[in-house]
Amino acid sequence: YDLGFRRVSYGVQDYNEKVQKAIHRIQPFEHVKQVTEWAKEIGYTSISHDLVFGLPFQNLEDVLNTIDQTSSLMPDRLAFYSYAHVPWIKGNGQRGFKDHDVPKDEMKRQCYEEGKKKLLEQGYHEIGMDHFALEQDPMYQSFQAGTLHRNFMGYTASKTQVMIGLG
């Protein structure tokens, strides 16, 4: 924050412990809640959470529970991505489970449709492919004004100057 950063994004994915173990992303809700609250206290002006549907061992109930928990924290923006299963890539990330552990296309579609419905009910606005924002967020305002931009990371309210990825 002291270096001028004002936006922060957390790669939540899902809060189900079995799903988290399968994707090697252990981060209990209480931890995400704490760092989200700290970011708000420090003064970050835009907080985003990334959620993923179609993860191994994930079902519709998991997706909806994750959305409920995430919405209780009121991040300004949400990305709601579809999981891409590419087990041939090096590393252990997608080799800790079997192909049949990944939800089938019909279930993924249901997770997206029901998840989107819940996000809209909870006050988020659909910006475009897999992005949602609250009304007060600059990305939503840019969407409304017709000045939204897109880069390889998703939508943005301004042209990308510098992007730094950590982790």
Q: Language-model features: where?
A:
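Conserved non-cysteine loop/helix-boundary elements of the Radical SAM core domain that shape
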Residues: Y1-Q122
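A C-terminal junction/extension of Radical SAM enzymes
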Residues: G91-G167
